[in-house]
Amino acid sequence: SLNLLFADWANRGLNQWTIEEVSITLATGIRDYPGGTLTMTVGSSTSFSVGETLTGGTSAATASVTSKPSGTTLAITIPSGTFTSGETISGGTSGASSTLAAAVDLTNVQSTIDILSAVVTRDSTDFEIQRVSRSSFLNIPNKSQSGRPNQFFLNRQITPVLQIWPAPDNDTDIVKFNRLTRIDDVDAYTNTAEVPFR
């Protein structure tokens, strides 16, 4: 069927129209980021600190704050556990707390098939970061070393993780990457197929 054809195209790299650029603001000392956009909506994000660990009051799920895009939104790392809508989350260093407005949706990150290229932007200058293999990343002796990131590895789990090295040394660098995403599946005759005419 069409879904098998789409999977075959993705495997052969024929779905170039699904490439999109993603920008993630880096946080000091955090080296694992989602392979796409991942945010949580809370009552207020102003009292939380970038880099601190959030903990769910009832779920005990945890994630780190990578940036604060708005007064009610937190960009986060991939959670350990599952945050539940309506629970109170608290910050590990700031002591701030807020109510989670909706469950964290991993769909955007899980649609990532591959990361084709990446750069780190510092002071309006883009610096290329090199892709390394799983074994090369594993063999880095001191993964907590900090500096301007110059290598990345995409850990292709169900929810892909972008691992960078060295760990960022500030909260202002931005990683920009071109990711290849999954073609939206066809499940009803009323769907519009996510394919170009030519």
Please identify what each model-predicted range represents.
Residues 1-39, 99-198:
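Glycine-enriched, solvent-exposed interface loops adjoining structured elements
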Residues 16-103:
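Autoprocessing Asn-cyclization modules and mimics
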